[in-house]
Amino acid sequence: MAAQRRSYETGHKPKCLVIVDDTTEWDRAVYYASRWAIRSGGGVVMLRIIETEEQNQQWLGVADIMRAEAREDADAALDRAAGRVNGIGAITPERIIREGDPVAQILDAIDKDADLALLVLAANPGPEGPGPLITMITGVIGSFPIPVTIVAGDLSDTDIDALS
């Protein structure tokens, strides 16, 4: 069961959850989330998900090395995104790194932070479709505990400024 949202109660402030992944359009989601935070007086929470496969015990040492490398990559990606958020609105975003199924990790992050008021994703504008995360989320979007905003991946900063 989802936690009661407290974003606008006294002593709380609304926060936007944005997913930082390896797609080319992640920057559009980060830009929109930053602009939203400026306008709403809220904050930005950046989530990076490391997708893990079932580990074969025989290869556990290799899996540990791969996990450590994935964590370093996740930190580097969040560093880039945090620089972008800070450059847009002088906001210091919260950072979360999780491992596992992306949809389950997003839902768990939302459940654990009652101040999260919005999930922002960006869609790939190309012919290959909106991207794997959006494809996964659309299957359960009707039961999401917070609103989901999908930003078109080909919107410019100026376009997003006008919309947010």
Question: Can you say where each PLM-predicted feature lies in the sequence?
Answer:
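A short acidic, amphipathic alpha-helical/loop segment
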Residues: 29-32, 108-109, 136
